[in-house]
Amino acid sequence: MNTIVKHTVGFIASIVLTLLAVFVTLYTNMTFHAKTTIIFGFAFIQAAVQLLMFMHLTEGKDGQVQSFKVIFAIIITLVTVIGTYWVMQGGHSHHL
């Protein structure tokens, strides 16, 4: 896929994901938790679109290495955030 087509597809996908998030927020009767979960899902999908379409993550001779670096960074971030939340929730329950 050439660059112009790739950028156009990425741009349209980003706009669609943004509009879907706005629609879910303004025009549905879901609970706050459901809306938040759906919007975070759209955000992660949009981040992947940005990395693949605009940042050319998988292109070039180091594309696979770059992909593994991003996956590793995501795993480390998730472990840190989830672990911190887990420890903070556990510690808070013992003080009450």
From Swiss-Prot:
Its EC number is 1.10.3.-. The keyword Cell membrane applies. Keywords: Cell membrane, Membrane, Oxidoreductase, Transmembrane, Transmembrane helix. It is a multi-pass membrane protein. GO terms for molecular function: cytochrome bo3 ubiquinol oxidase activity; oxidoreductase activity, acting on diphenols and related substances as donors, oxygen as acceptor; proton transmembrane transporter activity. InterPro entries: Cyt_c_oxidase_su4_prok (IPR005171), Cytochrome_c_oxidase_bac_sub4 (IPR050968), QoxD (IPR014250). It catalyses: 2 a quinol + O2 = 2 a quinone + 2 H2O. One of its GO terms (biological process) is aerobic electron transport chain. It is found in: Cell membrane. Signal peptide: none annotated. The chain crosses the membrane at residues 8-28, 37-57, 68-88. Its main location: membrane. It holds the Pfam family COX4_pro. GO terms for cellular component: cytochrome o ubiquinol oxidase complex; plasma membrane. It is an enzyme of class 1 (oxidoreductase). Belongs to the cytochrome c oxidase bacterial subunit 4 family. Catalyzes quinol oxidation with the concomitant reduction of oxygen to water. This is Probable quinol oxidase subunit 4. It comes from Staphylococcus haemolyticus (strain JCSC1435).
